[in-house]
Curated annotation (Swiss-Prot):
Gene3D superfamilies: AP2/ERF domain (3.30.730.10). Residues 1-22, 166-219 are annotated as: Disordered. PROSITE patterns: AP2_ERF. GO terms for cellular component: nucleus. This is Ethylene-responsive transcription factor ERF094. Disulfide bonds: none annotated. Residues 81-139 bind DNA. The gene is ERF094. Residues 166-181 have a biased composition (Basic residues). Coiled coil: none annotated. GO terms for molecular function: DNA binding; DNA-binding transcription factor activity. Belongs to the AP2/ERF transcription factor family. ERF subfamily. Probably acts as a transcriptional activator. Binds to the GCC-box pathogenesis-related promoter element. May be involved in the regulation of gene expression by stress factors and by components of stress signal transduction pathways. Acts as an essential integrator of the JA and ethylene signal transduction pathways. Activates the expression of the PDF1.2A gene.
Amino acid sequence: MEYQTNFLSGEFSPENSSSSSWSSQESFLWEESFLHQSFDQSFLLSSPTDNYCDDFFAFESSIIKEEGKEATVAAEEEEKSYRGVRKRPWGKFAAEIRDSTRKGIRVWLGTFDTAEAAALAYDQAAFALKGSLAVLNFPADVVEESLRKMENVNLNDGESPVIALKRKHSMRNRPRGKKKSSSSSTLTSSPSSSSSYSSSSSSSSLSSRSRKQSVVMTQESNTTLVVLEDLGAEYLEELMRSCS
């Protein structure tokens, strides 16, 4: 009986049971939506795609930097790879070689605009000294052909071929027409200078003469004639006494 009365009482009514089940279901849905939102935010903040993109761009930039460094190093090595060539601080390239006919003394062949031209000058000197046994920068046939095209060069006159090639390169680098123009300018300027000197001296003499004449004329114009009347010897003596 007590169980039936308790079951029929308000504590176990169907309304109370339905309201309690609804409130528990609502709280479960709220917790589920909260967990879903927090999970979405954490996923967006730490997205693996963003990390992958950052890593990819960082890796790509590092590859570009390494390629740039390798290119600069390769360019420097390419400039320094020529035998017997040295780069000058002002951008030119000098060719040098050791002359075996003169006890291995170092001979400066010349200064060139490009490293290739300096390397070819070295190859020409080396080929003239040792022939096919020389270690060259360019193929031997190219160097031999360049020696054949050279004019006014005698490599078999008894002196060192290196000196002959050096003389040829120095004549090539020497500026032309400056000495002749300077000598002609001095020759042409000498008569003009003498004429200018004579004209200046004549003008100075004329000016001095004109100055003297003007001074004499001014002196003559400034002087006036004073005629004294003869007052006798007594008056003259009195004047002399008064002055003394």
